[in-house]
């Protein structure tokens, strides 16, 4: 059973709410390269994200000196660059402004053809129209939504 779990975890990763707990290197550049098989396409996508989000000039800065929102952006850029079957995201947009949130929603949409996402959120509107299923806990009942239909 343990062997099956280890095998499963090789195909997925988790983004925790507190991005600080996930960083393993000092600089933003090192963090984005850590454990990655960097293709030209991944590098291009990371560069695009860094430029769009205003982080490109901070590549040599310590990730621990960034604001909480910037740390969350670095965490998402790093994890969305991975080629895994499944990403588990816990409050991925916490601390992000609307512009950054929309950027990552679009990136998730692009990647959803190749990857599965399990996303835990309190604010549902950013992912409206993105997910195939939505499970809500409402008044101690689970409500499952599937592409516009509801079943309890």
Name these PLM-found stretches.
Residues 81-85:
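A short, proline-enriched helix->beta-strand linker immediately N-terminal to the Walker B motif
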Residues 41-58, 77-80:
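Conserved ABC ATPase "signature" region
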Residues 130-148:
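H-loop (His-switch) and adjacent beta-strand-loop-beta switch element
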Residues 62-66, 70:
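Conserved ABC ATPase signature
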Residues 114-121, 123-129:
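Conserved H-loop
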Residues 62, 91-92, 99:
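Walker B catalytic motif
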Residues 18, 24-40, 45:
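Q-loop/switch helix immediately C-terminal to the Walker
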